[in-house]
Amino acid sequence: MKTGYFNSSVIKPLVKASAQHAAFVTGDIVFDWTGFEIPRGTAKLLGATIKIRSKGDSGSTVQPAGVNLLFAKGPVPDATPTSLGTANGEVTNFASTDIIGAMPSAAADSFGLRTLYQSTVSSSELVLEPNGNSGANIGVDKFYVAGLAAGALDFRSAVTVDGTPGTGQANLDVEDLDPDLFMVVGDVVHDEDDRLMGTISVFTDANNVVMAANLANAGVNDKLIYNINPIEIILHFQK
């Protein structure tokens, strides 16, 4: 039988701004179950490329560790597994029967000034076997991935809202740090209270971030802002 290889689409899990507002410690939940689809049928997970943004400080401090991945399938097709617990806290639901495997981070495989991790699966060779009829479309199966801190991850931001920019404008006035040091066009920005500001369209300068549309919520002076997708994952499979 012919062997095939393929990659998942880019997975951008939600890392809540309120969870990024404090540093993580080893074992903390970085992001809860996030769904992804792959071509229908059983597949072997060979590895993952995990891109992790730097800390939001003046030095763009590189993250000192990676993320351990857990995999699950829903209790019934297309049903999200039970939450692992509160983000930036310990797992409280390790007993879930939905979990089907794990892939530890390989810290020695890290490289790049913005921290790019290339991790390989353990010798157990994780195989993802789907529920029947999962996935939103014919020909695909749905699984879920969650991430636990493999060390002292720290996404804390030093960028604050300047004044009280209103919802009648697309410009978010900021101060204290140039957001361009750790944010990019296309990032979805929330404030520290998990209030949506918008999706970045352009950086006019170090104090002005223009969103793709008017601000979703009015800014609150001195509130810190965060990119809610500081981690991107591409999974590598064999069929």
PLM segments and residue spans:
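Short coil-to-beta strand junction motifs in C2/discoidin
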Residues: 60-67, 228-230
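C-terminal interaction-tip segments
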Residues: 1-21, 133-159, 226-239
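Extended, low-complexity, turn-rich repeat/linker tracts enriched in Gly/Pro/Ser/Thr and Asp/Glu
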Residues: 52-63, 151-156
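Autoprocessing Asn-cyclization modules and mimics
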Residues: 156-222, 226
